[in-house]
UniProtKB/Swiss-Prot annotation:
It comes from Rhizobium leguminosarum bv. trifolii (strain WSM2304). GO terms for biological process: 'de novo' pyrimidine nucleobase biosynthetic process; 'de novo' UMP biosynthetic process. Pfam families: Amidohydro_1. The active site is at D247. Zn(2+) 2 binds at K99, H136, H174. Its cofactor is Zn(2+). The keyword Zinc applies. This is Dihydroorotase. Belongs to the metallo-dependent hydrolases superfamily. DHOase family. Class II DHOase subfamily.
Length: 346
């Protein structure tokens, strides 16, 4: 197959940042993707509908002329979040989901939830009105190994929450383990998972073998090869409970290349090329559209995009920049460590 035409994709987990960084990265998303769930972990975080309204306006202002893109806003869940404010934002159409960050789990998550009981009034209201909860599924207790955080989160936090509130709609974001995949598959209702393009490509060797490679470090951290293969199988299966969420997370290079580097991989610019490569390897190009363009909208109660894009396979590798330049500084682009021959042509 030399070309494939699919409905315009969406990104169900995206970091756009703010200010000069937002202005420098947004075109890489809006050029290809029609919609994206926007992460709220700014400094300070997006915790109220008023915050979300202002952030959405900044995003739309940063869009290049002629780009059609809809930011789907989220709120950062805290122990003091107002159920009434969440419901008002959801009913207005502004808020698509609320994001749960266990405190300390990832970038700018220190204001997240430490005591789930204090967040229950909001979660109960969300369950009542059908508003999804997006979760960063990792525990942060120091005695838990970083490679086990997702599995322990499922057992100690997520499963008890879902048993208590079975009507709450939950998205496990950036699933990285076979444990997460199996847990989603076993659920009868109200559970789905997003998968990144980079977790389909790298395992933890990419970070550690031959020297520490900070531009492959993200949270949740890449896992063993058996987990990567489980993610691939889920992504290409056509199962409607799995969909693309890039978790594209730009950091300027000095914040990655240092003694205590930030977690995050910047993938927006080459995500679709990487995915076409992966799905071709798995003999599943006919299911790429489901993963990128159909399953996510169905889960979030939206219509799929009417616009189409075409990916073409060319003989010579596609050349992506090693870095992009923003007003905040240079950002290194994800390198899948093999040539990419698929690219978006229309």
């Amino acid at each position: 197959m030399q070309s494939i035409t699919i409905r315009r994709p969406d990104d169900w987990h995206l970091h756009l940042r703010d200010g000069a960084m937002l202005e420098g990265v947004i075109a890489d998303t809006s050029r290809t993707f029609a919609r994206a769930i926007i992460m709220p972990n700014l400094v300070p975080p997006v915790v109220t509908t008023s915050d979300a309204t202002a952030y959405r306006e900044r995003i739309l202002k940063a869009l290049p002329a002629g780009h059609r893109f809809q930011p789907l806003m989220t709120l950062y869940l805290t122990e003091h979040t107002s159920p009434d404010d969440v419901e008002a934002g959801a009913r207005s159409g502004l808020i698509t989901a609320v994001k749960l960050y266990p405190a300390g789990a990832t970038t700018n998550s220190h204001g997240g939830v430490r005591d789930m009981e204090k967040a229950m009034p909001v979660l109960e209201r969300m369950a009542a009105i059908g508003l999804p909860l997006c979760v960063h599924g990792e525990v942060t207790t120091p005695e838990v190994d970083i490679f086990d955080r997702e599995a322990v989160f499922i057992d100690t936090v997520l499963d008890p929450l879902r048993r208590r509130l079975p009507e709450l709609k939950v998205t496990m974001e950036h699933v990285t383990t076979s444990d997460g995949i199996d847990y989603i598959k076993a659920a009868k209702a109200n559970l789905a998972g997003s998968i990144t393009s980079h977790h389909l490509i790298i395992n933890r060797n990419a970070i550690l073998v031959g020297g520490i490679r900070p531009h492959y470090y993200c949270l949740p951290v890449a896992k063993r090869e058996n987990h990567r293969l489980a993610l691939r199988a889920a992504a290409v299966s056509g199962d409607a409970r799995f969909f693309l969420g890039t978790d594209s997370a730009p950091h300027v290079d000095p914040l990655k290349e240092c003694a205590c580097g930030c977690a995050g991989i910047y993938t927006s610019i080459n995500t679709m090329s990487c995915l076409a490569h992966v799905f071709e390897e798995e003999d599943a190009l006919d299911r790429l559209e489901a993963f990128t363009s159909l399953n996510g909208p169905a889960w979030y109660g939206l219509q799929p995009n009417e616009e189409r894009i075409t990916l073409s396979r060319q003989a010579e590798p596609v050349v992506f920049p090693a870095k992009i330049e923003t007003g905040a500084g240079s950002v290194t682009v994800f390198d899948p460590m093999y040539p990419l021959h698929w690219h978006v042509v229309a």
